[in-house]
Design a protein with these regions (language model features):
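N-terminal active-site segment of His-dependent metallophosphoesterases
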Residues: 1-51, 55
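Metal-dependent catalytic neighborhoods of phosphoester/phosphodiester hydrolases
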Residues: 41-54, 72-80, 249-252
Length: 279
């Protein structure tokens, strides 16, 4: 009989995910339920989403705030990947971005990048290596001082997705530079819309209901169900993530038989539990 494993926020930590799954006893064919926030912050986002999609039949995904944000921005990603050279320069921008870097934010500042046709060709055919060189190449290729519509997308992503709170620059770089198959895996993840996974048991287990969500459905991690004494609310195991801790946080409600588990141990590790260990 296959087992069910629940993984906390992964944040692109493929190595941490595999180490925790293997330590918990996961085997091929077992079910993996992810509480959300699979990408961003870590360095192996494409590898992580590819692994999950390869096991699509055995994976259940809860939408986290990071997935929701990428889903909203997917229309802009699609614009950037249409032209190979634009995709290349855009990928370079997000690969080399560091907090505190400056870049043009107004039409007047873009005018400072205007150059002759010969200089434009020289910039485009060059081999940029730094953030500012990629910015200049993107602006030159798209003639952003005349039409800044594409640059506005870059600017928006830099302002919204890079640095706190999403730290998604590595993910955007990987999405723009990876294979079509890997991009399809990213989009498969971001288009998941389930906000909750429910499992009910009729066997005489300690818990009759399992509720898996991205964050504590009642507030912060020490919040609890005020209706916990009502039938159907008691004897419930709540599993969630979103707020990171150095280890899995558990608190029990003796009066109702409910237990709350925050399994987000990012960024240093990926919290994984085998559900049968708690039943």
């Amino acid at each position: 009989m296959s087992e069910i494993f629940v993984a906390g926020d992964i944040h692109g930590n493929y190595q941490g995910l595999m180490e925790s799954l293997n330590a918990a006893g996961w085997q091929e064919g077992d079910t993996i339920i992810c509480v959300g926030d699979v990408t961003d912050r870590g360095k192996d986002n494409a590898r992580t989403v590819s692994f999950l999609q390869e096991h699509e039949c055995d994976v259940r995904l809860v939408q986290g705030n990071h997935e929701l944000q990428h889903k909203k921005l997917l229309q802009y990603y699609h614009v950037l990947i249409k032209v190979p050279q634009i995709r290349l320069f855009a990928a370079g921008i997000f690969r080399t971005y560091k907090a505190g870097y400056t870049y043009p934010k107004t039409k007047e500042e873009l005018k400072e990048y205007e150059c002759s046709a010969d200089r434009r060709i020289e910039i485009i055919q060059g081999k940029p290596k730094t953030f500012h060189a990629f910015v200049r190449a993107f602006i030159a290729y798209t003639l952003a001082w005349e039409d800044d519509s594409l640059w506005k997308i870059i600017l928006y992503l830099l302002e919204v997705m890079c640095g706190n709170p999403y730290d998604a620059e590595r993910t955007i770089y990987e999405y723009l530079s990876c294979t079509r198959k890997q991009r399809a895996a990213f989009e498969w993840l971001w288009n998941q819309t389930a906000t909750e996974v429910n499992i009910d048991y009729t066997e005489p287990y300690k818990y009759q209901h399992i509720v898996i969500t991205h964050n504590n459905p009642f507030g912060r991690y020490y919040s609890y169900d005020l209706d916990e004494l009502r039938p159907g609310h008691d004897k419930t195991l709540y599993i969630f993530g979103h707020i990171p801790h150095s280890e899995i946080v558990r608190f029990d409600r003796a009066c109702s038989g409910c237990t709350y588990l925050d399994i987000d141990t990012s960024p240093n590790s990926v919290g994984v539990i085998k559900l049968s260990d708690y039943l």
